[in-house]
Amino acid sequence: EQDPWLDVAVDWDRTIAYRRYLWSLGLGVAEAMDTAQRGMGLDWTGAQELIRRSLDAMRDVPGAVMASGAGTDHLAPGPDVTVDDVIRAYEEQCEAVEAMGGRIILMASRALARAARGPEDYVCVYDRILSGVREPVIIHWLGEMFDPALEGYWGSGDHTQAMETALAVIHAHADKVD
């Protein structure tokens, strides 16, 4: 018997067929989001395979739209993780998605939520990542109601203050945010 949390077995044919079905309806696909961010059994290596296979399939579908999650889920949050570690982790995933020809959805980072000491750390990380991407990205920010490990994201437990920090980053990099 397989443990789906430890022994991931993806039915690639059905997975890609479902993406093709979504594209046939005129819908876009946000790829490798739940799997990469929420720990649903697919690690970063598996997420890369999913992104690659979906991008390959997308190229055969006129008008298909897809963006792929890039985050830091391969970096385990911990007391020794620094903001620089988070930057390197984001860069690794962003570079991988771009190297495959994909568009990026920049996911919130549990490691950043733990390593950051205030809004300035978020500004530092997002400035660096947004300055390095080739094409505009979608910034994806889940609140703590979806992931308690993201409490205080953007350097504040007050959502209005957090949004001000996020909006300042977006404004500073308007050409890099979709």
What are these regions (language model features)?
Residues 141, 163-177:
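Acidic/histidine-rich catalytic cores of soluble enzymes
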Residues 105-106, 176-178:
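Catalytic beta/alpha-barrel core
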Residues 1-161:
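Active-site beta->alpha loop and helix N-cap motifs at the rims of alpha/beta catalytic domains
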